[in-house]
Amino acid sequence: MDLQRIYDRRKSRLVDELAIAKYGMLGLMLMENAGRNVAYELLARTPCRRVVIVVGKGNNGGDGWVIARHLDAAGVDVIVLLTTAPNEFRGDAAVNYAIANLAKIKIIDLSRTPTAEAIATHFAEADWLVDAMLGTGATGEPRGAMRLAIEAINQSSVRTLAVDLPTGIDCDSGGAATVAVRADVTCTFVTLKPCCQVAACRSYLGEVRVIDIGVPRALLEEIDAMP
């Protein structure tokens, strides 16, 4: 776990870009490594019998689909809550959505769920909630079903794990949107982020774990040398 490096939004994006363009890695490989290692982190935190994963449409949601698949393979009862229409998934996230669908993982569309209270009914008997809605690249206010899901998560007593960063937290400033997930554990990828050093942000992050996604050390050293 690398606790020395701190990469902002720009450098975090460069990790993926260089891994693919220069080091010959596939985006699907990076997503698989990220999601699998978060799933292992969850499985190490017992009890982990039932997990509800709330996904967005981007790569953070794609990580959520990988997490769901690995938890399902380990015998965990998994439910995935969609905050976006299935046809909005693109690229690697769409591939992993299709795999989860074929694997018959339980998927529930929240787009017509009218209230946070209605969303919270899906949390019954869960050991963990997983926030896989927005990650380091996100800015601005969460809207629609995503906003309602955040309210439901924060009103719940179920332990919450955020993927990369809690939805609604700005990677660089540590500022919180008017609604932002308050996580018990945050699994951020490759390095810490600037927001991890902001005192006011700590109540949203909870325990921070840095998760390896298998990028070469040479790649990180190359980014370290950049201004």
Swiss-Prot record:
Which InterPro entries does the annotation name?
Answer: YjeF_N_dom, YjeF_N_dom_sf
Keyword line: Isomerase, Metal-binding, NAD, NADP, Nucleotide-binding, Potassium
Q: Which residues form the YjeF N-terminal domain?
A: 12-221
Q: Name one GO molecular function term.
A: nucleotide binding
Give the protein's biological function: Catalyzes the epimerization of the S- and R-forms of NAD(P)HX, a damaged form of NAD(P)H that is a result of enzymatic or heat-dependent hydration. This is a prerequisite for the S-specific NAD(P)H-hydrate dehydratase to allow the repair of both epimers of NAD(P)HX.
Q: Which family does the entry's similarity section mention?
A: Belongs to the NnrE/AIBP family.
Q: What is this protein called?
A: NAD(P)H-hydrate epimerase
Q: What is the lineage of its organism?
A: Bacteria, Pseudomonadati, Planctomycetota, Planctomycetia, Pirellulales
Encoding gene (name): nnrE
